[in-house]
Amino acid sequence: HVSYGKNDEERNDLLENKALLNSISTLVSEKFLLINLRPQAFQSHVSSFSPVSSTAEAILSKMDLINSKVCKHDPTKTLILDLFDRIIKEAIGIVKMLNLGLANDAYGSWRTLHEAECIIKLLIEGGDDLQRVYLKHIVYNNAFREAIEDKDATDQIFIQMKAEMKNKGLKSKDMKKYIEYGWLYSSNSFDSTNPAFKLNFRDGVQKAAKLSKYSVWYEAASELSHSSPVFFYSREEYFIELATIGLYDVLERIEDMFYKYMERYGVITQI
């Protein structure tokens, strides 16, 4: 780093600088000392060479290899493939966190992964019609976040959104949850006439996806993300187990959805 951009003569001068060489020598010694101590610092971790880690990485790498060839990162063209891309990367991130001994972070990320699997499950089951509605709510979110430059277009979006909300009996205070969860009204799995169904994740997305058995797991992961006492005083080994089991549970369902989707739309045969 010190010699970057310097010519040979300047590099030779650096080699004569004893103070600099001593400083570099100290840094190198500290680096190797820290590397030596690293296994002790992360005693509660999943080894990257363990079957638990390597199996998950192998499954995810194969899915990523297939998906990366067809995913365009354009929701109007490859919405489901884009969502699979994010899910795969989130799952790989959880594996890396477990390797580093970041059990709390891994379990907190499982929460995001579970949210994503519920959403993609409903969107695949709902087909093109539901996916179009979901895309519309992405536009609503962009308008709400003032990400659309055309003010007239933004105004028209809000007029349309407010009309839809009024039709559903929602008030202005419900706008944020309508933007995020309003697409559920178009899902056959969401019963808007049943008071048990609500516009949120737990009583909306999760319930409609028929994965409510994970609500307790989700709640525990939510506590971790809010720096509750669980975050400060949790036992690392406990959350390593939860994150690992949770990851493989999601991975089993996601892998099944992924290959069925790819086969149904002939994606695998196109590669």
Task: Place the predicted regions along the sequence by residue.
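A generic secondary-structure signal for well-formed alpha-helical elements
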Residues: E117-E125, S228-P229, Y265
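Secondary-shell segments that build the walls of catalytic and ion/ligand-binding clefts
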Residues: H1-C71, K136-I271
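Predominantly late transmembrane helices and immediately cytosolic-facing juxtamembrane segments
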Residues: I124-D128, R132
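Short capping loops/turns at secondary-structure boundaries
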Residues: N99-L102, A106, V133, D150, ...
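Short, solvent-exposed helix-helix connector turns and helix-capping sites enriched
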Residues: F49, L102, G126-G127
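Long, hydrophobic/aromatic-enriched structural stretches that serve as scaffold segments
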Residues: A58-K121
